[in-house]
UniProtKB/Swiss-Prot annotation:
Residues 316-344, 1142-1184, 1219-1257, 1327-1355 form a coiled coil. Residues 1270-1299 have a biased composition (Low complexity). Residues 1377-1450 form the J domain. Residues 117-142, 241-318, 357-383, 459-480, 512-541, 556-575, 908-946, 961-1046, 1077-1168, 1192-1241, 1254-1328 are annotated as: Disordered. Keywords: Coiled coil. This is Auxilin-like protein 1. Residues 357-366, 512-524, 564-575, 908-923, 1037-1046, 1117-1131, 1147-1168, 1192-1226, 1310-1328 have a biased composition (Basic and acidic residues).
Length: 1450
């Protein structure tokens, strides 16, 4: 084997020293196995070393070579069997090594260091290093160290905890260069066993505590060593896999080193799985204390380079081992001494990882133990991402918390950010405390308040070492100690304490001594330890408004949960929400004020919440009216900022949080928020109020507490105080109503300024002082606070634009629908007389001025009806639980007919006269009693006639009067006794789900004499008009039935308004006290709705005199201030007088109403039928249109295809005609040429014959002349003979010359010969003529066939082409499919393709096919022209495929 040997004679102990920085703790078993591990060489894997160390066979000379030299030196051969000692039996094999080496070590960058810390570091270096170990300064770079990527995994998390549950850091070996680390790791969530699968480990980053403060250190950049070790192999066995560029950071008392583990470290961790399991036994000793180990303690590193000596390997190894042990003991003793010196000044401020509850115990001054409930689960999550080696910084812990908070609460990305986004500035703790105290002094001086009421973050931080077990910080690399000056946090209890003091000062009522004592005992434990002289300026108080308001809305809107749910779970979720939000707030405060705000999430894990809450402020208590045990909610701490709720408030509204007690939010915070809202809109600035009302409708519930505060102040001591705990349903509904009155507060003050006001000056002054107190608490010294608060309102306007547009669109649709229904309804009334309506309108003309007075109020609260739909679901839930389902359903039906009778009810808005209302109330009350006796009448009939617009007017007025009653409590309480009696009389109607509603009782509230006189005049006028109406009703009943019905409708309008008010108030006034208070005001209506309406109409129709008496009795009741006994007695007397009347006319009214309902039902059915018909027509039209479109599309497509086809046909025909013409021209040319040749031959033959005959004639004439001279007597005979011979041989005999010459000897012989010749010539000419005729017949036949072929060519060519497509030059395919083109009548027997596999079978089939389709064979068989044409084409295709087949075969 070959190893690299160092050229320098470096000692073995120096090797240990240089490599000491690679480890921090080791186990007790097989500690020094790493001494004998060697660097992994590509030539020799680890398994080879294991085989060598164990030895092979019985040979005692197989001893492993244990020297591990450096890798950058020359090579030398080593004899493995040079030693006799088997070290494997002494030190154990690699597979059994049990030391623990961290895969990653923490390195913290040192950015800025104070001079004190630097001096202390130098002192520690001097005292902590031995003479033979070189010092490593901050800037000094070690060549043995290389960078390893940080992955937020602390080394000590792989070490299990001890019996006490705490974890300590095993003493760093003495041979490690540089000062001894004094880092203490407190992490209870440790891995007991490293599994083979990948298990990410969360990061635990710690700061080094110092006596003077905390410092952050930066790791110096190191140069890489000459050899790069694949760091990924280190974690091959324990499942932790990283990249080779990862860096491991090591803490050394503020000095940072970048360490790269050598290959021996890789060998160690690549052992068996059991080695990883033995890591669980490494931990011993408590946290923050280093214990001295024995000689065999884990003080030797698991890997280092050893110098090799060829001759004495064992001797040098033993010497180096002893020296390493001694140095380790020395180092450990030094470290122990240094830790003892630091015990007194140590301070730990860590925050645990878990966001859940944790228990913290304080064991002395040096032991810190943290037990986190969910830390094991959190260990499976990597909270920081890998960073590049060049960056060499920790992953931001704040980002990790922000991610976890966003994941837990479903908050969008941009809302929660960690404090690492801030740009930190490093300050001393002393300066921070001084600056904090200065801010507190200025705040107390500004408010002139005693110290300790408001507490800041720094005070809580100072009391932590006393009240709580110290927690450790979890800093970012970039995060430093940050002052908290601009952003204090307040508890609800602290705010409630101040509020309670103010309330007691004005009301004289004290909170129960029992709870006060309990509060004092609990607070003393905390307040005594907090600095009393700290309080923030007014800007910080203003910053608390948005978060407090958000928290209130969050508590109120969340459904009430059962009492059985543990209070600890409530605190955990609330604290998580607050802490997650305070990170965002601290970031905003830093950007605006320039201060670095420390995130309040230091308590987000709940580590100190429980302890703090137990000792915290418990002043947020609310007394119930009997003084029983109060319900106390634990105070929640919040760090607030002025701009936090701009984006976060919308998310918190939807966040499900456990419901806390309403008294907490009502008592301590809500009133302050409400006064700050009032401060935004001054009384004179009505436009600003209106704008705020329209733009911020969702913030209405925060006004609830201001009502409660003032009610506590105004309530007499003898009466029951309204400051009591209400159910969630009552509070939600009452809050929504009260906010209507508060929104129009300033507008109502302007209206009331025209009339005299009689108010209690003492209570009014108290109210003013209390208002100014809260205004001062939440208003800055300059206009910055107001501007920021106003900007908060302005910022939400944009978010409501979309909602308002959608709401307006929805309302328009509803208005159109209702108006359509109204038109149908009005159509049934078109024949009625209009005189009564005009009279009714004239009666109302005198009161139009009242409407003008309230026009501004209607404008201010016009948006309330739009917001009714937003809160419809909340109102429904509240009404169902309180038994108001019936009233809510009535209100919903009223909303459906909101604008149906807009014109008829326009003048009802001014019907606010209290005296007239009392008269109507008495009448309806009497008729209600009669109706209760007679039985129930169908209540659904009049329900459809309700008019919403009239109800809207009175809903607005109810809100105004409720607010006025708050301002004048004495007048309101004066009527409370009357309310009780009225409630008793009308208990049945209240139980049915309806409640009596108050209206504008201006005489009681204004208290002005002039107003009372004017109302008295109006009362008289109303009485006269009422008598006239009753008289006219009686006359009309006897005369005209239609006129009577019209008067009924006029009277219904008034009753509808009362019903609308009753239905609205049933939802608005779930509280019993508010119902009673509403019932006592002047404008009283019948609460039963339809029954009161029917009774009232029947009484007015039937008995004019009886109702006159009722009006007189009512008038007397109105003149009385208390009106209790007289009202009751008059109702009883009048009930006896009118009971018979109502009983007789109940059926008539019921029939009348039934007819109306039937008419409306028929109209509704007709409308539905029309809608259905229209829908069917529309669908039929749509279907017809779709069909027409489809047909049109098809027609267009067909036309396009036809045009294309027409364009293609001429082209094809032209091509076919050209081809036919070519073929015809060739045949015709051939026939013409043949014909010409035949004619020429005939002409030549005829010319020859004519010449011969002429020649014979001339010769015969000459011979005859000579014979006549010779023989004179025989002239005539010879002439006749010559004539016969010439005639008989004219065409046959051509050479008559010799014959004539021979005939001269024999007279009869030449004549026979000439005859024979002529016959021969005749036969020849006949044969020629026959041949010519035959030829002509053949030519004609050929021409016919050609014509037929041309006619069939187009169709046959298409068939042949279709058959041969894809099979060109494929002989097998053509032959196997030949039957498809030839046809069944051809007689061709198909040949399957399976028979054409071999070449021989293909050749045989080809010959058979060619014989069958050959043109000559077809001619012999007498085939038709079509068959001939097809066979010719097939023959040509087969011939071409055969040529291709032959080429392929060759």
């Amino acid at each position: 084997m070959e190893y690299e040997k160092s050229p320098t004679a470096t000692t073995f102990s120096r090797k240990i020293s240089n490599n000491r920085s690679h480890s921090l703790s080791f186990s007790a078993n097989a500690v020094y196995d790493g001494v004998f591990s060697s660097p992994v060489n590509s030539k020799s894997p680890l398994v080879d070393y294991g085989e060598i160390f164990r030895g092979s066979g019985p040979s005692p000379s197989s001893i492993p070579f244990l020297d591990v030299p450096e890798l950058n030196v020359g090579k030398v051969k080593v004899d493995v069997r040079s030693s006799k000692l088997d070290y494997s039996s002494v030190f154990g094999g690699l597979g059994a090594c049990d030391f623990a080496v961290t895969p990653k070590e923490v390195i913290i960058k040192s950015e800025k260091k104070t001079s004190i810390n630097e001096d202390k570091k130098r002192n520690r270096r001097k005292g902590g290093n031995s003479s033979d170990v070189p010092l490593c300064n901050e800037g000094k770079k070690s060549p043995e160290m290389v960078r390893m990527k940080h992955s937020d995994i602390s080394y000590h998390q792989t070490v299990p905890r001890n019996e006490n549950g705490a974890t300590h850091l095993t003493q760093v070996p003495a041979t490690m260069p540089g000062p001894i680390p004094t880092q203490v790791v407190d992490n209870t969530s440790l891995l007991h066993k490293i599994e083979s699968k990948s298990t990410p480990i969360p990061a635990v980053e710690k700061k080094l505590p110092c006596n003077e403060g905390r410092e952050e250190v930066k790791a110096s950049r190191k140069q890489g060593s000459k050899t790069e070790v694949d760091f990924e192999n280190i974690f091959a066995r324990d499942g932790c896999s990283t990249r080779d560029d990862s860096t491991c950071k090591t803490v050394s008392n503020g000095e940072y080193r970048d360490v790269k583990p050598p290959s021996s470290f890789q060998c160690t961790l690549n052992g068996e799985h059991g080695a990883s399991e033995r890591l669980s036994g490494l931990n011993s000793g408590p946290s923050e204390r280093y214990e001295t180990e024995d000689a065999d303690s884990p003080s030797s590193p698991p890997y280092f380079d050893a110098e090799t000596d060829e001759n004495s390997v064992a001797a040098e190894s033993s010497a180096a081992l002893k020296k390493a042990i001694e140095e380790a003991q020395i180092r450990m003793n030094i470290a122990k001494q240094m830790m003892e010196k630091k015990k007194s000044g140590f301070r730990s401020c860590a925050k645990l990882k878990s966001c859940d509850d944790s228990k913290i115990e304080n064991k002395g001054n040096t032991k810190v133990e943290g037990i986190t409930e969910e830390s094991r689960d959190n260990n499976s999550q990597i909270l920081g991402e890998m960073v590049k080696p060049s960056e060499q910084s920790f992953s931001n812990e704040g980002d990790q918390h922000a991610k976890r908070a966003r994941k837990l609460w479903g908050v969008p990305e941009g809302l929660l950010k960690s404090t690492s986004d801030h740009k930190p500035e490093e300050l001393e703790e002393q300066d921070i405390i001084t600056l904090e105290e200065e801010q507190a002094r200025r705040g107390r001086k500004h408010w002139e308040l005693p110290g300790g009421i408001f507490k800041s973050v720094m005070n809580s931080k100072q009391q932590e070492p006393e009240n709580l077990a110290p927690a450790k910080p979890e800093p970012d690399t970039k995060q430093e100690v940050q002052p908290i000056t601009e952003n204090p946090f307040y508890t609800f209890g602290q705010l409630g304490s101040k509020l309670k003091c103010v309330v007691e000062a004005f009301t004289g009522s004290k909170v129960s001594q029992k709870d006060e004592k309990q509060f004092t005992e609990k607070e003393n434990s905390t307040v005594t330890q907090m600095v009393q002289d700290e309080e923030s300026d007014s800007q910080e108080m203003l910053a608390g408004i948005p978060v407090i308001e958000t928290y209130l809305r969050e508590v109120e809107e969340t459904p009430q949960q059962t009492e059985s749910k543990s209070e600890m779970n409530i605190e955990e979720k609330s604290e998580s929400t607050i802490c997650a939000f305070t990170e965002r707030s601290s970031q905003n405060m830093e950007k605006e004020t320039g201060w670095q705000v420390k995130s309040a999430c230091k308590f987000e894990d709940g580590s100190g919440v429980k302890d703090f809450q137990e000792n915290g402020d418990h002043t947020c208590n609310v007394l119930d009216q009997e003084g029983e045990k109060e319900i106390v909610s634990e105070p929640q701490e919040m760090l607030v900022g002025p701009d936090d709720s701009k984006t976060y408030v919308r998310e918190v509204e939807e966040t499900p949080t456990p419901s806390l007690n309403k008294t907490q939010s009502d008592d301590s915070v809500g009133a302050m928020v409400s006064f700050n809202r009032v401060n935004i809109s001054e009384p004179g600035n009505i436009d600003e109020v209106q704008e705020a009302v329209h733009k911020v409708p969702r913030r209405r519930r925060v006004w609830k507490t201001s009502e409660d505060v003032y009610n506590m102040i105004k309530a007499p001591k003898g009466n029951n105080r309204p400051w009591q705990l209400e159910s969630a349903e009552n509070e939600t509904t009452a809050m929504s109503f009260h906010e209507e009155g508060v929104r129009i507060h300033h507008a109502s003050e302007e209206i009331e300024s025209t009339s005299g006001q009689a108010s209690d000056s003492g209570l009014q002054e108290n109210w003013t002082v209390l208002k100014q107190m809260f205004r001062q608490m939440f208003q800055t010294a300059d206009t910055k606070g107001e501007d920021e608060t106003y900007c908060l309102v302005e910022s939400e306007r944009g978010h409501l634009d979309i909602h308002q547009k959608a709401q307006e669109k929805y309302e328009q649709v509803e208005v159109e629908t209702v108006r359509t229904n109204y038109e149908a309804y009005a159509h049934t009334r078109e024949n009625e007389d209009e005189s009564a309506q005009e009279t009714y309108c004239r009666k109302e003309d005198g009161k139009v001025e009242v409407q003008g007075k309230t026009s501004l109020v209607r404008e201010l609260i016009g948006e309330e009806l739009e917001m009714a739909s937003l809160e419809e679901e909340d109102v429904q839930e509240a009404s169902e639980e309180a038994g108001w389902v019936q009233g809510l359903s009535e209100l919903n039906e009223i909303n459906e007919h909101a604008d149906s009778h807009a014109e008829m009810l326009e003048y009802d808005r001014s019907e606010t006269d209290s005296n007239n209302s009392r008269e109507r109330f008495d009448q309806t009350q009497e008729q209600a009693e009669e109706t209760m006796i007679d039985g129930s009448i169908d209540t659904d009939t009049s329900r459809s006639s309700f008019e919403m617009r009239q109800g809207d007017s009175y809903i607005e007025e109810v809100g105004i009067e409720q607010h006025r009653s708050d301002q004048f409590p004495e007048k309101a309480s004066a009527v409370s006794n009357t309310e009780e009696h009225i409630e008793e009389i009308d208990s049945d109607s209240i139980q049915s789900g309806w409640s009596v509603v108050e209206d504008d009782d201006r005489s009681l509230q204004d208290g002005g004499a002039s107003q009372a006189e004017s109302k008295h005049d109006e009362l008289e006028e109303t009485k006269e008009e009422s008598d006239e109406m009753k008289t006219s009703l009686g006359v009309e009943r006897n005369g005209d039935k239609k006129e009577l019905e019209h008067q009924f409708e006029c009277q219904e309008n008034e009753t509808y308004r009362s019903n609308v008010e009753a239905a609205e108030s049933s939802c608005r006034f779930p509280n019993g006290e508010e119902i009673i208070g509403a019932a006592t005001n002047g404008n009283m209506k019948e609460n039963e709705g339809e029954e009161g309406e029917e009774s009232c109409r029947s009484s007015m129709e039937e008995e004019g005199d009886a109702t006159s008496d009722i009006g007189a009795a009512t008038d007397g009741n109105m003149k009385e201030n208390e009106g209790e006994e007289s009202c009751r007695s008059s109702m009883e007397e009048e009930g006896d007088a009118t009971s018979d009347i109502s009983q007789n006319k109940a059926e008539t009214v019921e029939e009348h109403l039934k007819k109306i309902d039937e008419t409306r039902e028929k109209e509704r059915e007709r409308k539905q039928e029309r809608v259905m018909v229209e829908r069917a027509i529309r669908e039929a039209r749509e279907r017809a249109f779709a069909d027409a479109m489809e047909r049109a599309g098809k027609t267009a497509m067909e036309k396009a295809k036809a045009v294309a086809h027409r364009r293609e046909v001429p082209r094809k025909s032209e091509k076919g005609s050209v081809e036919v013409n070519d073929k015809l021209s060739s045949a015709e040319k051939a026939s013409m040429q043949a014909k010409l040749r035949a004619e020429r031959a005939a002409v030549e033959r005829a010319i020859t014959e004519v010449r011969e005959r002429a020649m014979e004639k001339a010769l015969s004439g000459k011979s005859a002349a000579s014979q006549a001279k010779s023989y004179g007597g025989s002239k005539s005979f010879s002439s006749s003979g010559e004539r016969r011979g010439s005639s008989s041989s004219g065409t046959e005999n051509k050479s008559s010359g010799p014959s004539n010459s021979s005939n001269q000897t024999a007279k009869g012989e030449p004549i026979q010969r000439c005859k024979a010749r002529s016959e021969r010539h005749q036969r020849t000419s006949d044969r020629a003529a026959e041949a010519l005729a035959e030829k002509k017949l053949r030519d004609l036949k050929t021409q016919k066939e050609q014509t037929e072929r041309n006619r069939l060519a187009e169709a046959l060519d298409a068939d042949v082409k279709r058959w041969s497509s894809g099979k060109e030059n494929n002989l097998r395919a053509l032959i196997s499919t030949l039957q498809y083109i030839l046809g069944a009548e051809s007689g061709w027997k198909p040949i399957p393709l399976t028979d054409l596999v071999s070449s021989a079978s293909v050749r045989k089939a080809y010959r058979k096919a060619t014989l069958y389709v050959h043109p000559d064979k077809l001619q012999q068989r007498g085939a038709s022209t079509q068959q001939k044409y097809i066979c010719e084409k097939v023959f040509d295709l087969l011939k071409e495929a055969w040529n291709k087949f032959g080429a392929d075969e060759r």
